[in-house]
Amino acid sequence: MGFEGDVRPFLEKHCLKCHGGEETKGKVDLSAIKTMADAEAHTELWEAVSFVIEDREMPPEDEPQPRDDEFAVFTEWYEDQFLGAAEAKPSEFKPRRLSGPEYRNTMHSVFGFDLEVNIIEAEQTVTEKSLIMKLLPTDPPGESGFVNDTHGARLSTTIWSQYSYLAGSALEELFSPLRSSELEVLVGTPIKGELREAQIRSLLTHFSERVFRRPLSSDRIEASLERIQSESGSDLREALKSEMKRALMSPAFLYRGFLIESDSKTGQQPVDDFELAERLSYFLWEDMPDDELLSIAASGTLRESEVFTAQLDRMLKSPRSRTLAESFGSQWLLLDQIHDDRQEPTYLHALVNQPLDFLNYLFTENRPVMELIDSKVTFANSYTGEFYGDDRKQLERYIKPRGVERVSMPNQKIDLVESAHERGGIITMPGILGMNRGPILRGTWLLRQIMGEHLGEPPPDVPAIKSGPKDKGLTFRERFEEHRADKSCALCHDRIDPLGFALAKYNDDGGLIGKNQGRVKKDAPLPEEIDESGRLPSGETFQNFQELKAILMTSEREKITRNAVEQMMRYALCRKLGRNDSPIVEGITSTIIETDGTWSDLIHGIASSVVFKETLITASPKESHD
């Protein structure tokens, strides 16, 4: 099979009428792509083409449709020859702005404290108290689907003004009596009275190393000292704060990778040790490197295999690695959409933190990747414990602090014994089921977030599924058959519906129908009336969710594993994946499947890859802290 002999004729027969020659709908022109070399020069185009062909969105309904074997020819070429023949290469080097959470965490690491706004007598999370997160606009997800992908984010005058205000506020607090201990940490010696010149030099040295995530030369430190002395007049501290603010407002602080050191040559090359340390720390911690990691980067030994592995393992064991679950895991699985109709903050906290604690356990305790789908343990407290039958008896009694009306109870790890048949894994957690109410939302979430399949947008003219007098006595599944009669709908719903209906025995709160879990509706069906059976596009059938889970753990294991690898790679690299990332994805996926690999194996595979450790320089980067 080849492009010229198989794919080009497919394009000429079914695509060029609208996407070539005089007419180029959607700004997609395929007419000039005649050879494999032409195809390789348009890598991003083929991803979009593959999606619309896979979803049968193209050709349009009113045009002659390819046969199934013709569709298969294109898909096989795209997966096996276009992606399969690619060489693993890093992407072009591009500095990117710190995301809001990265900026907040980095400011905390630089100063040793958070800028906070407290509401008296209100329980708040660290993020809710953060002045930074209240002032900075929320970063939208980039092309990768994650908010740390800020390559296309504009630095507006509004954001610049907010950076200036936050930098000034942090410096004012640092030099206040309240933060004398934090200031002494940066100075390195006890402060008695006014700062001496040696202490100012020490302060600038330590501060700049944190701000720029690498040490600056003594010449630059001396230049800063000269500016302070020339501007100080009668107020040395104000001049010092001005110089420190200058550093906090520099691109070298606000952007990742701005100070990367490169040979004068262009082309593919390893990133320097400090950039590698940054890539590791923002991947695992969403924060700047700590002192140990910076020290190893300075020694030039970070890329040595044993040293690199030891540091990665150390960082995963650190409490700071919880951000991998809270940031990556939450964005991947859309956990911010978990809600509670009861408007009860402590109950919502329990629903959200259950999957977060579970993901943190998987990521940091070296658990198998497929435990995401089926696990013998979960995390629960008295709120979520109601969904786990007698297994909740393992929970130790939590005593609420005196004088506190409401408190968020910590989760405890429990073994699933009595509830193992109905629970286990992330899919059947009450918060996940509750945010995806009904078979369509549940099936769509499972297909997209867990299995990584692409779904096109539904046709705009398809009406919602409503219940009328003629539908009395019909189940949702029966009423839905009319909707499925539309061929354009059936293409996606053949993939969505079996997954969603397999979860039909769980109510809107995520409780088991008939087990008095969650809020029970008056018109809820009896357990024996629920049809959980389904047939997947592969032809495999199941009678209930337990049988579907068995299919997910076997036949769909490769698809689920590959999606996990792709999602974490996008997050780690802060960008969408391209053709030259495919060999890394496939290599890590194969290794995990062959060895029943763990999340730690997955993380090590990404961090050790050429796309993580190297970069492509197309123009000599400037090293400047101005």
Task: Give residue ranges: language-model regions.
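Aromatic- and Gly/Pro-enriched helix-to-coil junctions and flexible linker segments
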Residues: 1-186, 209-210, 214-217, 221, ...
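Extended surface/linker regions that mediate inter-domain or inter-protein docking
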Residues: 77, 102, 106, 110-111, ...
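Short hydrophobic alpha-helical segments that form membrane-spanning helices or hydrophobic packing faces
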Residues: 207, 218-226, 257-258, 382-383, ...
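Structured all-alpha helical bundle cores of eukaryotic regulatory proteins
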Residues: 258-270
